[in-house]
């Protein structure tokens, strides 16, 4: 395996993460070790097998500030899928011990602001902090069709919609609107899911768009917290596409979580095809839900978690 070091003080092989990634031959497995510092760069990583390791979430930060409604160099708006701070496409991806942040600002001012756009066959994020406001983490693939012109403008617009398996462990993910979204099969274990308070009437954690026969998003043993959001104003999710799925298992929910738990997508009438399930929730936000949210018994929850680990956890 190729090993490359990045250090801003000149002691490494490169001074920027982007330069290090570009130096890796596509088919060569590589480990890039990134020293402390704020790396202000828009990262594009399209490699077959790559590992990025920082010096810790507090120490190594990759930051950029594009927003979906801000102008792009081509004269059009940037749109959601060109706003990313880091774009990953490949086969095997491992990211550890760093922060990826989009600091463009609140969605009301700059639109969607993706921190990480993840489109790899197998992904591991461990001890990673993902920070933004609207649309923080995009778990590819995209849906088959866009609903508005240029809605999918970006690196994956014409790419095949291939399944991806993504695993997030001991991560912190922060945002306010649909800040974990997409069509991946993804397992979030022992993560902190933090809703940022931008004084919105309602916020949404997930916006799944996966296949009807897919896993969707599964959260196990996670803490759902907020930056002092008003009680009952944050939904665990809403379906970005009709067959979206989110499961919340053995998680701790703050008082900011809405009593309904999940919400339909705006005024659409096909949300009854979505699947939102819950089991073992505790905390002030763990209350009786409506009929739309299925409550799993312990055996069903264990089986779902087993399937999620088999599909998403690295071997």
Give short role names for the model-derived ranges.
Residues 2-315:
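Sequence-level preference for short, compositionally simple segments enriched
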